[in-house]
């Protein structure tokens, strides 16, 4: 999801938002390391972009967003991003509370983890391939909506 994250960042920067990346190359960083990097730069928000997976191919479809708590600014950000991705064509699986996730419980700012479709679902892959730019714009606009 690095390419999608970079595309989202480009759109945000075009809209005069300062963007910090935990990585710009395809190298692994642990969720804790990512959270600590976000804290170190004093980010106002932290958005972690991923693809979901299920035990069986084509079992599930759609976008899901995870937050530390269903209340507060992170939940509003998640709602905004999900709604925008739903307009692109992704099924909206909603917002999930997941305080056990390190990237959510180690950050000091409102944080969301966005799962943009299922990597093992053909329909989600086809949608993301066909509407990659729209998905990037949707995530960026979901962020801009709450700034």
What are these regions (language model features)?
Residues 2-147:
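Active-site-proximal helix/loop segments of hydrolytic enzymes
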């Amino acid at each position: 999801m690095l390419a999608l994250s970079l595309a989202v960042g480009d759109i945000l920067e075009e809209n005069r938002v300062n963007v910090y990346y935990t990585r710009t190359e395809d190298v692994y960083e642990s969720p804790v390391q990512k959270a600590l990097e976000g804290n170190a730069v004093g980010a106002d928000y932290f958005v972690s972009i991923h693809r979901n997976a299920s035990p069986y191919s084509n079992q599930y479809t759609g976008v899901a967003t995870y937050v530390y708590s269903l209340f507060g600014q992170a939940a509003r950000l998640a709602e905004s991003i999900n709604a925008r991705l739903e307009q692109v064509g992704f099924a909206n699986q909603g917002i999930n509370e997941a305080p056990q996730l390190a990237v959510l419980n180690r950050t000091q700012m409102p944080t969301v983890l966005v799962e943009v479709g299922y990597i093992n679902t053909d329909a989600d892959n086809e949608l993301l391939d066909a509407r990659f730019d729209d998905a990037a714009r949707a995530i960026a606009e979901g962020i801009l909506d709450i700034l």
